[in-house]
Amino acid sequence: MKWFLFLLSTIFVQGILGYHVEREYAWRNVTFEGVNPSSYNVLHSIPTGFAYDAETQKLFVAVPRRYPQVPHTLTEIERKKHPERSPPLSKFSGKSSKDLISIYQPVIDECRRLWVVDVGMVDYKEGQPKYRKQNPAIIAFDLTKENYPEVDRYELPAEVVKNPLSFGCFAVDVINPKGGCSDTFLYITNYEENTIVVYDKKNKASWKVSHDSFKPEKDVNIVLDGGKKYSYKVGIFGITLGDREATGNRMAYYLAGSSTKLYKVSTGALKKKGARFDPIRIGDRGPYTEAITLVYDPKTKVIFFAESITRQVSCWNTQTPLDSNHTDVIYSDARFLFGTDISVDSNSTLWVMANGHPPVDDPDIVNNEFYKPQIRLLYVDTRKSIRRTRCDVNGNKP
């Protein structure tokens, strides 16, 4: 416990680090546009993921049904319409062929398709009569067309996933965007089953991959405001894709949520069912740097990590060895508690979300007298974010 108190005190002394980072939105209580506040519980509406469409300046925000009384699981915000700090969330305006049950993360690909994985069930038992259990499904909506029509849907079979509630992050791999969008793969992590579920859109097929590097290493301890301590132990969670090679393959970088080690493997080992899987351990990021989400920026060749317990966003340039001498911090704030999602949009802007809610199996966490939602969404230009850090290998060094 002493090390953790020391770590937190260090962060509070630092105050805010990240001169170029701007806070776009912050919520204590999420509200929904057009929905009577008395019909839902604001403490239960906790966003976990987002995607930003730079062309329309619209944010898509996922609010999973982990608790009762969540009116919409997929929502949107028009930045032009809502310049205020804590805008209400509007129901997703796209057209789905089935009701959306519970979504944790949206992702926009290079073809401007919005992908989601609907886990098909709620996290609480009393909600099953209202939200009838469905097969977990991968769904895509076309953002280039009016009303965002559904353009792909695939229900995942039981042999590839036993518990869809333990899905982590996912990455979308468009093999040749200039040649068309049909040849696409999704790589979905499962932090409880320690697997990656692969979806082949073109052939409407799926399979799972297992490896020891997907497993968690130790419990992660996190202290919420008020001093309440929680622990969790989760396997593979975050995944991001590197630059596309001439063969169409890319490096997939991944990490377990309860580990500080980073691995990579060619997507060629994922795209072919039964292929040999030989990942490379790149290195260890150092003590207390656990994260559940990461993203690669092709412009800077940097991977950014939204860390879980340090209340900071860190970076590592993939052109350098991975160790504590080649990583750095681009943002640190005592109010940035538990990073849940991070992405780079088509304009090379880094976006990162924290919601103050770790992945612990404790329904009473939101009923804790000290619990107060701290949902923050930040953005910064990727080049500006690494200026004068160890991640800026071509610019000014610190």
From Swiss-Prot:
Q: Which SUPFAM superfamilies match?
A: 3-carboxy-cis,cis-mucoante lactonizing enzyme (SSF75011)
Where does this protein reside within or beyond the cell?
Secreted
The record's keywords, sorted A to Z, are: Secreted, Signal
Naming one, the record's GO cellular component terms include: extracellular region
Q: In which tissues is it expressed?
A: Female salivary gland (at protein level).
UniProt main location, coarse: secreted
**Name of this chain's protein:** Yellow-related salivary protein SP04
